[in-house]
């Protein structure tokens, strides 16, 4: 399940429900206050909407660049998988707003990302994913929730201070 997609009405006209579509756009975030608590809401803002055929060209792919805004959290899952949570602040081109995107690195990338510091520049390629989890409320009350995040496939670039560390070739992913 992907996050909500905001499609301008002019683009949505004459579209069939459940039709394969190809969307290019921005992955954005905003805070929504609910019951006195703030929740990070993520959505795709469509800028291009084309007919898709369900082929590999229609794959779920995202390239993000930004700055680490929280310390990375490295851990092992109950099944032994190495993961590292990252929160990446992505500035809009005009610098008037910043989107905060939760990301998850796996295995080798998780070990590498565990040493990153707040303020480090990163460029990643990955995919948008969702997961359902149980949120314990008061007493025995449990609520099912959905979390959206970027699953990192590769860390393309990492810059700490004046040192740049190129982990992969950008040309490989921007075909």
Model region roles, listed by residue range:
Residues 1-175:
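Single-stranded nucleic acid-binding surfaces, predominantly the OB-fold ssDNA-binding core
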